[in-house]
């Protein structure tokens, strides 16, 4: 009756054993360094305001409740982990499932495993070094190369991303078949050119850390005190994959509120639904999150590289098309 159902896992059993060993090694890396493992909710009362993230939601119907309550599946454990930092946990890490209502393909699955950790009193560069240590231990790779976003853009695109005028960026984007108008959002143009032109040319032989993204792409990172055009944000790339995204974390609750509000302004311009701002995160920031750097790393992609797999479903027990 059910013989034709595709019940088998998308990863073979040998791969699942290898994946488990890698995850155990990740845990050992942090416990050996005295970093506390934590667990936080997958469901949250607040979604994310970021215009580039699409989220899943569900309705919670409590007994005797007059109406249901919308809850959001987290795109990251970041907000809850920062509340723990404000409570005084010190350095923490987490391995968890996160959800993004976006594409599914060779590198993406709507549900995936994230490693996220926070290091109070680390600056961005010290955390970059720790990510490098982790990659060397898990992947047995060469030490990472580091370059600024500005340098990478100038080297491979041929223009300065911090000063190039919009018409120049539009012309370049069209050269690479991006259909856009002259009034296209500047960051959209930069992100397209970076992903299309720069990313394929870096991190092939060894991991590469790209740091100091434009201030307009700061997200939850601090703006550099040395150059207000850039944010204290970095990303790691290796073997054609974006592996990690890290920040010298913004801890000013007023600035964070302003950024959330600006996200909703941008959402209105793009005809996207408004998102309620996470007041609990702002309360934690106001109470006092220590000076901290944090990073999120895609575990499935890390396993892909470690085991030389080309598609993300090859390292997952069940991908979205077989869940």
Curated annotation (Swiss-Prot):
Gene3D superfamilies, per database record: Bira Bifunctional Protein, Domain 2
Top-level enzyme category: ligase
Tree of life domain: Bacteria
Protein family per UniProt: Belongs to the class-II aminoacyl-tRNA synthetase family. EpmA subfamily.
Function: With EpmB is involved in the beta-lysylation step of the post-translational modification of translation elongation factor P (EF-P). Catalyzes the ATP-dependent activation of (R)-beta-lysine produced by EpmB, forming a lysyl-adenylate, from which the beta-lysyl moiety is then transferred to the epsilon-amino group of a conserved specific lysine residue in EF-P.
PANTHER family per record: ELONGATION FACTOR P--(R)-BETA-LYSINE LIGASE (PTHR42918:SF6), LYSYL-TRNA SYNTHETASE (PTHR42918)
Official protein name in the record: Elongation factor P--(R)-beta-lysine ligase
Name of the gene encoding the protein in the UniProt record: epmA
